[in-house]
């Protein structure tokens, strides 16, 4: 089926097969079709609603066109973003903490709609975000942490960047980042911008051959575990999917923290709040990071439940600042980090 026939199929609101989606995604990322056709596919899919097969096919195509490192046992904590709430970079904080006890290949990018992306906050801390594959494998083996910058590891995405920017609306590519980790990480925490998208993404995860993944969407449509209200969770192990909800009570906590108290102005502010939380000088941020770290510890089976996970997370935060310093010493510049630490002390 040629490109025009596939486009007509979408216009008729018919779903593409996984192979059809993979084929057109490869053509798009290799710039084999005009930008106007790419725009037609992206808008058509968004209007129709992306199917499980289409998400899976596009994710496999992104993997086909990516640079890779070999570390499938790693954990990633990348979310979809796009919740518009401008909270501190909790998934990056979790990645830094977990790397004290388990290898983390943190896949991420600069902010698109928010105040600070994972690349931005790591850069604000002084970490070198441009890490090529050979060095990346060395770092994760030696220090249990590496950042895999999406712009570097997905060079073919430059061929759709202009279309995405011009359209200015959410497309299928917004949900693909977490599904395309360059280390082929088989353990993953994925925050999702909408709870309605969770079942569909869970089915795609099953098709993409992970070992264990936890998807979640917290109140109020936050792509993190929330300190306020209910968080919807989908836990996937191989081909088994279990869904449930959690609240702060499941972590052994009582008082909710409004999400409005967890916002940041920019990447430097986010970095500062993370370090303050590690130091015990920002209680709201500490709890937010703590419950998300607890879920990650549960995912990688370091704890039996979320209450134990939260207690363990507090211990990891207590040693968080020296650990982050050691990561930056290996791959970065301590100037920014030291200035931030001075502001805390």
UniProtKB/Swiss-Prot annotation:
Cofactor: Mg(2+)
Cofactor binding mode and count: Binds 2 magnesium ions per monomer.
Entry binding sites for Mg(2+) 1: 91, 224
Residues reported in the UniProt entry to bind anthranilate 1: 79, 109
Catalytic activity, reaction form: N-(5-phospho-beta-D-ribosyl)anthranilate + diphosphate = 5-phospho-alpha-D-ribose 1-diphosphate + anthranilate
GO biological process, one term: L-tryptophan biosynthetic process
EC number from the UniProt entry: 2.4.2.18
SUPFAM superfamilies: Nucleoside phosphorylase/phosphoribosyltransferase catalytic domain (SSF52418), Nucleoside phosphorylase/phosphoribosyltransferase N-terminal domain (SSF47648)
Chain sites annotated for binding 5-phospho-alpha-D-ribose 1-diphosphate: 79, 82-83, 87, 89-92, 106-114, 118
Residues the entry annotates as binding anthranilate 2: 164
Coiled-coil annotated residue ranges, if any: none
Superkingdom: Archaea
Keywords assigned: Amino-acid biosynthesis, Aromatic amino acid biosynthesis, Glycosyltransferase, Magnesium, Metal-binding, Transferase, Tryptophan biosynthesis
GO molecular function, one term: magnesium ion binding
Pathway stated in the Swiss-Prot or TrEMBL entry: Amino-acid biosynthesis; L-tryptophan biosynthesis; L-tryptophan from chorismate: step 2/5
Binding-site residues, Mg(2+) 2: 223-224
GO cellular component terms given for this protein: cytosol
Enzyme class: transferase
Record HAMAP family: TrpD
Similarity comment: Belongs to the anthranilate phosphoribosyltransferase family.
NCBIfam families linked: trpD
Protein name stated in the entry: Anthranilate phosphoribosyltransferase
Organism per entry: Sulfurisphaera tokodaii (strain DSM 16993 / JCM 10545 / NBRC 100140 / 7)
């Amino acid at each position: 089926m040629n490109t025009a026939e596939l486009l007509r199929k979408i216009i008729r609101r018919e779903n593409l097969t996984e192979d059809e989606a993979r084929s057109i995604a490869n053509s798009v990322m290799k710039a084999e079709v005009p930008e106007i056709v790419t725009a037609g596919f992206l808008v058509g899919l968004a209007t129709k609603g992306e199917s499980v097969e289409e998400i899976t096919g596009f994710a496999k195509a992104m993997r086909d066109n990516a640079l890779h490192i070999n570390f499938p046992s790693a954990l990633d904590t990348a979310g979809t973003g796009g919740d518009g709430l401008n909270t501190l970079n909790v998934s990056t904080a979790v990645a830094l903490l977990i790397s004290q006890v388990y290898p983390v290949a943190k896949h991420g990018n600069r902010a698109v709609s928010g105040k600070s992306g994972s690349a931005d906050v790591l850069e604000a801390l002084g970490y070198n975000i441009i890490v090529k594959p050979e060095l990346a494998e060395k770092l994760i083996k030696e220090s249990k942490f590496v950042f895999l910058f999406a712009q570097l590891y997905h060079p073919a995405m430059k061929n759709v960047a202009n279309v995405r920017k011009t359209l200015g609306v959410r497309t299928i590519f917004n949900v693909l980042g977490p599904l395309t980790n360059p280390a082929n990480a088989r353990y993953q925490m994925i925050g999702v911008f909408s709870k309605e998208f969770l079942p569909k993404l869970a089915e795609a995860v099953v098709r993409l051959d992970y070992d264990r993944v936890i998807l979640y969407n917290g109140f109020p449509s936050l792509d993190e575990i929330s300190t306020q209200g209910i968080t919807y969770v989908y836990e996937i192990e191989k081909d088994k999917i279990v869904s449930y909800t959690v609240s702060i009570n499941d972590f052994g906590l009582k008082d909710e923290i409004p999400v409005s108290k967890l916002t940041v102005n920019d990447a430097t502010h986010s970095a500062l709040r993370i370090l303050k939380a590690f130091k015990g000088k920002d209680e709201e941020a500490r709890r937010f990071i703590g419950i998300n770290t607890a879920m990650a510890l549960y995912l990688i089976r370091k704890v039996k439940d979320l209450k134990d996970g939260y207690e363990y997370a507090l211990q990891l935060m207590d040693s968080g600042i020296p650990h982050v310093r050691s990561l930056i010493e290996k791959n970065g510049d301590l100037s920014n980090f030291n200035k931030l630490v001075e502001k805390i002390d």
